């Protein structure tokens, strides 16, 4: 997680669906 306004995508390094 730790994504930014994109439905929690790979902004933290891992997809978090």
UniProtKB/Swiss-Prot annotation:
Predominant place of localization: secreted
Tissue expression profile of the protein: Expressed in skin granular glands.
Keyword presence, Isomerase: no
Intracellular or extracellular location(s): Secreted
Keywords annotated in UniProt: Secreted
GO cellular component terms given for this protein: extracellular region
Family, per entry: Belongs to the Frog skin active peptide (FSAP) family. Septenin subfamily.
Protein task: May act as an antimicrobial peptide.
Designated name of the protein: Septenin 1
Source organism (scientific name): Osteopilus septentrionalis
């Amino acid at each position: 997680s730790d994504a930014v306004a994109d439905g929690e995508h790979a902004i933290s390094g891992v997809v978090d669906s």
